[in-house]
Amino acid sequence: MKKNLLYLLMFLAMPLAFVACGDDEDGDNNNNNGITTPINATGEYDGDIEIFINGENFFQTANPDITSSPVSFTINQQANTTSLSINDSILILGELVLQVDGVPSTADSEKLTLNGTDMGIEKNIIGLDVVINSITGAFTKTGAGNLSIEAAALKGTPLEQEVNIEISAQKK
């Protein structure tokens, strides 16, 4: 009887020994049945801004000990475009306000890439009327981001100046 009871318990416990061993590890949850989930770079960022006018660092021109200024900005990522909003006070210049919507972008599981070239957007940056030619950059899933804004001030005049803004930042 004891032997039969042992066999019965073994027979009942046998299904517990067979476990489904599928590949159910999500990793970083970016691939779902072959569908890649893009990162979400929307949010607020803190970083440093460098402004170059005709290739010279604007901050160093004003003060040789300063090469950049702290800056905060917001990225709003949509399906194929991204909006950039800077509204912050920066060293020497004071208030920097820039709102650009509809910057072409692509996203994958690793990063958001801004690839706005040949934009021709007229804005006022740091007191100069400029034409923004391009906004490019990348924001990674770790929250690190880099932006490059290329513009021309006083375009079409003998005093035309090239304005380049470089920002490196981290998501808050």
Each language-model region and where it sits:
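Hydrophobic lipid-interacting interfaces of membrane-associated proteins
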Residues: E50-N54, S89-G94, M119, L154-G156
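Predominantly extracellular/secreted and cell-surface proteins with exposed
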Residues: N63-I135, F139
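Transition segment at domain starts
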Residues: N40, E44-D65
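Bacterial Sec-dependent N-terminal signal peptides
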Residues: K2-N4, M14-D48, G156-K172
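Surface-exposed or flexible loop/turn and strand-edge residues in extracellular/cell-surface modules
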Residues: T42, D46, S68-P70, V100, ...
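Edge beta-strand at a domain terminus
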Residues: L98-K111, A144-K172
